[in-house]
């Protein structure tokens, strides 16, 4: 499923008062074009060149502040990896569960794209380990993973 299809499908299933967040990167930049906001709908985003790792902590705060409202975050696997320290906070029993959609392309996509454009397809350090599973790493913190 493409990021565009995922954004559209998830947004169409959410109620109008839902809070949506995204991180930086190619997958979220695509999604920035799709959310619409009606009846108090909120969109939390760092902007295209904002702080990497913003998505997870932003939905944590939004869900703690508005437990009664659905909150969904979107991030690429690179940006999500930056915020892995926040996973220790999510495991607190008194905190509500959150929903984070992680797009897995196993690379720092924006950086790889820029280096292939600017340096004749010469890129280094942009590939992520395909064996890493964020959910397996933090299973004891109530995380689980779904793929499609």
Walk through the language-model features, giving the residues of each.
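Thiamine diphosphate
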Residues: 29-142, 148
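Cofactor-pocket helix-loop regions in the catalytic cores of large enzyme subunits
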Residues: 1-46, 84
């Amino acid at each position: 499923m493409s990021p565009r299809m995922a954004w559209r499908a998830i947004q169409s299933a959410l109620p109008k008062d839902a809070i949506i967040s995204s991180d930086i990167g190619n997958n979220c930049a695509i999604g920035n074009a799709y959310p619409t906001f009606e009846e108090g709908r909120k969109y939390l985003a760092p902007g295209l060149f904002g702080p990497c790792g913003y998505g997870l902590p932003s939905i944590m705060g939004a869900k703690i502040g508005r437990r009664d409202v659905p909150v969904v975050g979107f991030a690429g696997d690179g940006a999500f990896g930056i915020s892995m320290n926040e996973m220790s906070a999510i495991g607190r029993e008194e905190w509500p569960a959150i929903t984070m959609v992680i797009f897995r392309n196993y690379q720092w996509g924006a950086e790889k794209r820029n280096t292939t454009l600017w340096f004749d397809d010469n890129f280094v350090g942009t590939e992520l380990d395909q064996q890493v599973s964020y959910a397996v790493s933090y299973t004891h913190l109530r995380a689980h993973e779904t793929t499609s």
